[in-house]
Regions:
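Active-site nucleophile and cofactor-binding loops and adjacent substrate-binding regions
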Residues: 8-11, 36-43, 58-67, 82-86, ...
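Phosphate/ATP-binding catalytic cores across multiple sugar-kinase/actin-like superfamilies
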Residues: 21-24, 28, 171-194, 402-411
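Glycine-rich phosphate-binding loop plus the immediately following alpha-helix
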Residues: 5-15, 19, 96-139, 152, ...
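Glycine-rich phosphate-binding loops at beta-strand->alpha-helix junctions
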Residues: 44-47, 175, 188-220, 234-237, ...
Length: 433
């Protein structure tokens, strides 16, 4: 059962957001004359690993698992889970309560909640009033579904044509399900997935977005023998968090003692973030502009050399993100000094090598990555070799005798001789030829 819950739009810093949420939850409980006793904590979402390390959480699970756990906890019949969050869209397709397939948008922000939120703010309307404004429109422009960049351009064009802000907002809500089902998941025939749809994620607080999704899904069942059963998760904004909590409960029931730092400590986390050229990573060609978050917390976190997972072998699930200067490596000095007693958290890196500052530590990470590459085949590399593999067809006749050749035969011979001098390239984009 969900006793209390807290939800807010992200302010851009997961640590600050978490401190606000924890304070809100505690206040709700204490207003009822009760006291919280935390037996387990789970995290999920993009900042799950960061928050897990800072809070001492017991579980950090991926969003697809968290949302599936949450839906199955509240509803017996689930065929499709559609999570529309602030940054992405996730579709989980189930069979007998087991996930058999899922779709994610990892490259484009089309149709996500933040796009609707930012558009609403550009019009000077709080996102909480989005649906009220959109439902007040008597007509709406027809947006083409697809890339968010093109949709932003469409907004400008429609404004020039005289469309009102509420009409544009209605049009954006109306195109949302097309982005979900036709652009991201590319599943036009929804009826083949099943009949029970659960809508989750913070965007489902926007009733204009919900209505457009319901209308679209129902339209895909017209003329079919079955009808769609569409449910908005009763805790849609917190559905992922509930799934993470379910995993924490499971660990507690199996005898796991929580490592959570405590409510008071979590509200008093002191940190300082730095983003500058001094934090830029040069360990690969990406040259990521990283952010260093120096955190002061009371609960113990071992020094990096004792907890640096890539030194323990290639089977570790992920590298620990907290970094502190090794006592044995006093010769290394960071460009951004680390205050005594603080632990450094490095974010904004696109690969594992950017988790550290010292080149020697980076080499240790690379050893672990190389070990993984040696232990597992690189299918992208194999495909690149196979697609350009020389093809030798069977010989079906004897060679052409050396006699007087016609013009066509001479041309063919010339082409055959020049074949080894010709290179043909096939473009590759996102590992697809």
């Amino acid at each position: 059962n969900v006793l209390v819950k807290a939800y807010q739009l992200s302010k851009g810093n997961p640590i600050e957001d978490t401190m606000d949420i924890v304070t809100s939850v505690q206040e709700q409980v204490e207003l009822q004359g009760a006291t919280l006793n935390i037996l387990g904590v789970g995290t999920t979402g993009y900042a799950k690993d960061v928050l897990s390390d800072v809070l001492g959480a017991d579980a950090a699970i991926v969003e697809t698992v968290a949302h599936t756990e949450s839906a199955l906890q509240f509803y017996d019949e689930v065929d499709v889970i559609c999570d529309v969050g602030g940054q992405d869209i996730k579709i989980m397709i189930l069979n007998n309560r087991q996930v058999k397939d899922f779709k994610l948008n990892t490259q484009c922000s089309a149709g996500n909640g933040y796009f609707l939120q930012s558009t609403s703010q550009d019009f000077g309307i709080p996102v909480e009033n989005y649906a009220t404004e959109a439902f007040g429109a008597e007509s709406m422009p027809d947006f083409g579904y697809g890339c968010a960049v093109f949709m932003q351009s469409d907004i400008v064009d429609f404004q020039r044509q005289g469309w009102k802000k509420e009409e544009i907002m209605a049009g954006l809500a109306n195109v949302l399900p097309k982005n979900i089902w036709l652009y991201v998941s590319q599943i036009p025939n929804l009826s083949k997935l099943g009949t029970n749809f659960v809508l989750q994620g913070g965007t489902q607080h926007n009733m204009a977005a919900v209505k457009s999704q319901v209308d679209f899904i129902e339209s895909r069942f017209r003329g079919k023998a079955e009808t769609a059963n569409i449910i908005v998760h009763e805790h849609c904004g917190e559905s992922g968090a509930i799934g993470a909590g379910i995993e924490a409960i499971r660990l507690w029931e199996n005898g796991r003692e929580t490592t959570f730092i405590g409510l008071e400590s979590s509200k008093e986390i002191a940190y300082q973030s730095t983003t500058s050229e001094d934090t830029r990573c040069y360990f690969c060609k990406n040259k990521c502009l990283r952010t260093f978050i120096d955190v002061k917390i009371d609960h113990p976190i071992e020094d990096k050399d004792e907890q640096f997972t890539y030194k323990m072998g290639a089977q570790e699930p992920r590298p620990v993100r907290f970094y502190s200067r090794s006592k044995e490596k006093k010769e290394f000095e960071s460009k951004v000094p680390l205050e005594a007693g603080a632990k450094r958290l490095i974010v904004g890196n696109s690969c594992e090598k950017g988790l550290v500052e010292d080149v020697n530590d980076m080499r240790e990470i690379k050893k672990g990555l190389d070990a993984k590459l040696d232990a597992n085949p690189n299918f992208i590399e194999l495909a690149a070799k196979e697609i350009f593999q020389s093809f030798q067809p069977e010989v079906i006749s004897d060679a052409i005798p050396k006699i007087q050749m016609t013009a066509n035969q001479k041309e063919r011979k010339s082409l055959m001789e020049n074949r080894n001098k010709i290179r043909i390239g096939i473009p590759r984009v996102l590992n697809m030829y």
